[in-house]
From Swiss-Prot:
The keyword Metal-binding applies. This is CRISPR-associated endonuclease Cas1 1. Its cofactor is Mg(2+); Mn(2+). Homodimer, forms a heterotetramer with a Cas2 homodimer. PANTHER family: CRISPR-ASSOCIATED ENDONUCLEASE CAS1 1. One of its GO terms (biological process) is defense response to virus. Mn(2+) binds at residues 161, 226, 241. Its EC number is 3.1.-.-. It comes from Methanospirillum hungatei JF-1 (strain ATCC 27890 / DSM 864 / NBRC 100397 / JF-1).
Length: 331
């Protein structure tokens, strides 16, 4: 899938002859020389942020079989221009939606075992650095990994993954002092500061996963492990699973261990739940973004790059039957 991403703000995308021109608008603070882009072989033009595009430019891209994705400044897609008739993007969506159940189950097993492996790795890291005895929790997560490989249905797989996640959060809770009130995972609403940070961080991961999938030419909706219902973006949730521990959970541990927030930075509204204060939220969001955009140990890439790689892998696994190899967290 040949895709081009335009980010920032204020660019004007126009048709000039048989090519597209991309230039800064009249009100832009910085003038840049115009750039040209050929529509030949272009499968997807992704436009993120506030820009303008002419109908002639839309017609030029779509007449060559390409699609245009419109995204907000955070990378959330909100619309597409698609060519009439067949196109590479439409065919890829159809192949994704019609993936056989056996293939989906195989991919789902890989997603679960990869996610459980990354949970085990973070627990082992906490045990080594903090001196906790997490042997029981690690063993339970490993048992869940072994059982996941034998599951013959998505329902049984979800049950096994749930038991492994429960054991993981029992061990993970030891990383926090009693003042944080964290006893395990809770959401909708989060009941304590740690859960509030986890949920907010996972939301940031969804944005990364969604953008990576759209740029790779895959629909966020047709997944393998999670169900598609009520407009839930199943493939986004699938892709996020293996990144929760290495990106968000690890950041939460470091963020609170460095005293970058206190319990007073969180509020408890009358309607229930726990909310992050404005200043703490800014600091925490910056910490998560630093993690996402920083180089990953043992990899010559950032997590943002790895998201793109894994999006292409999971998409090919669904549409072409390739083996899905999840990201393995190493410390």
């Amino acid at each position: 899938m040949n895709s081009v991403l335009i980010t920032g703000a204020g660019y004007r995308i126009r048709k000039r002859g048989d090519v597209l021109t991309i230039e800064t608008g009249k009100d832009s603070d910085t003038a840049e020389p115009p750039r040209t882009l050929s529509p030949l072989g272009l499968d997807l033009l992704a436009i993120a942020g506030d820009h303008s595009i002419s109908t002639a430019a839309v017609r030029l891209v779509t007449s060559h079989g390409g699609a245009i994705a419109l995204m907000d400044g955070l990378g959330n897609p909100f619309g597409h221009f698609l060519p009439l008739g067949r196109s590479a993007l439409i065919e890829q969506y159809e192949a994704q939606a019609s993936a056989p159940e056996e293939r989906r189950l195989e991919i789902a097993r890989s997603i679960c075992t990869g996610a459980l492996e990354n949970k085990r790795t973070l627990l082992s890291n906490l045990e080594r650095i903090r001196g906790f005895d997490l042997s029981r929790e690690i063993r339970l997560v490993e048992d869940a990994q072994d059982k996941a490989l034998e599951c013959q249905s998505l329902d049984s797989l979800r049950g096994v993954e749930g038991s492994g996640a429960h054991a993981y959060f029992q061990g993970f809770s030891l990383a926090f002092d009693e003042e944080w009130g964290f006893l395990g995972r809770s959401q909708n609403p989060a009941t304590d500061p740690v859960n509030s940070l986890l949920s907010y961080g996972y939301g940031m991961l969804y944005i990364q996963a969604r953008q990576a999938l759209v740029l790779s030419g895959y629909s966020p909706y047709y997944g393998a492990y999670h169900e598609t219902y009520k407009k839930q973006e199943a493939l986004v949730y699938d892709l996020v699973e293996e990144f929760r521990q290495p990106v968000v959970d690890r950041t939460v541990v470091t963020f609170l261990a460095k005293h970058m927030a206190t319990p007073d930075d969180f509020t408890y509204p009358d309607e229930g739940g726990c909310m992050i204060g404005t200043m703490a939220k800014k600091k925490y969001a910056a910490a998560v973004l630093t993690r996402i955009h920083g180089k990953v140990k043992y990899e010559e890439q950032t997590f943002q790059d790895i998201f793109k790689r894994q999006a292409e892998r999971i998409g090919k696994a669904l549409t072409e039957g390739d083996e899905y190899v999840p990201y393995r967290y190493r410390t």
